[in-house]
Regions:
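Short structural boundary motif marking the start of a folded domain
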Residues: 2-7
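Glycine-rich beta-strand-centered segment in the early N-terminal region that forms part
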Residues: 27-42, 55-109
Length: 109
């Protein structure tokens, strides 16, 4: 098992958006899978929508040095994100890197 870091975004029912850099356990690859060490990722508009949503970026404050920030979602916009209340969602779905390990049948990758 490998430990990695992942950016996550969560909005509370109270309208507080939290962006965190969390440590996550990454399992060893199964048959036919590879584990990639990500070295570069783009930030797409869809990533920004999930990352920041309708939060007021001028309200940004650091909560934990280097790993957590918070912003307020304006009252008039909070209903637009009700479906994601209290879900700590991973941000981003693209990346480039090198194969770190491979499962059975994927060694050639």
């Amino acid at each position: 098992m490998t430990v990695s870091k992942q950016i996550k975004s969560k909005i509370s029912k109270e309208g507080l958006l939290t962006i965190s850099l969390d440590e996550v356990n990454v399992p060893d690859p199964d048959d036919g899978e590879v584990l990639i060490k990500v070295q570069a990722t783009p930030i797409n508009p869809s990533d920004l929508g999930l990352l920041v949503g309708p939060a007021d970026v001028s309200s940004l404050k650091e909560v934990e040095k280097g790993s957590v920030v918070e912003m307020k979602v304006p009252d008039g916009l909070i209903r637009s994100v009700a479906a994601r209340f209290d879900q700590n969602l991973p941000v981003g779905n693209e990346g480039a890197g090198i194969v770190e390990s491979a499962g059975k049948g994927a060694e050639h990758l």
